[in-house]
């Protein structure tokens, strides 16, 4: 009975995913970060425009996303590539 109870507790913790575990890209090269508490969104947003027509982007965890036509705001792991 104790084994069953312990198993249920472990399964509950895993299913509830206690704590903040959202992972976001934080660089163009693919570096990732576990987001701090309170930042539950991943974002990729345009910060400048190069003369050849390419955008420079910033990648980060955030609590509120920037608005813009080329920006990505999402809430699942590694969704801001």
Curated annotation (Swiss-Prot):
- Give me any GO biological process, just one: venom-mediated perturbation of transmission of nerve impulse in another organism
Listed under GO cellular component are: extracellular space
Disulfide bridges in this chain: 24-42, 35-61, 65-73, 74-79
Organism source for this protein? Micrurus mipartitus (Red-tailed coral snake)
Q: Does the keyword Metal-binding apply?
A: no
- Expressed in which tissues: Expressed by the venom gland.
Which coarse location class applies to the principal site listed for this UniProt protein? secreted
Q: How is it modified after translation?
A: Contains 4 disulfide bonds.
Record's function text:
Snake venom neurotoxin that blocks neuromuscular transmission on both avian and mouse nerve-muscle preparations, presenting a postsynaptic action through the nicotinic acetylcholine receptor (nAChR). Reversibly inhibits twitches in mouse phrenic nerve diaphragm and irreversibly in chick biventer cervicis muscle. Has no cytotoxic activity towards C2C12 cells up to 180 ug/ml.
Q: Which UniProt keywords apply?
A: Acetylcholine receptor inhibiting toxin, Disulfide bond, Ion channel impairing toxin, Neurotoxin, Postsynaptic neurotoxin, Secreted, Signal, Toxin
The family annotation for this protein states: Belongs to the three-finger toxin family. Short-chain subfamily.
In terms of InterPro entries, this protein maps to: Snake_toxin-like_sf
List the subcellular locations.
Secreted
Q: What is this protein's record name? A: Mipartoxin-1
> Which first-to-last residue range defines the signal peptide?
1-21
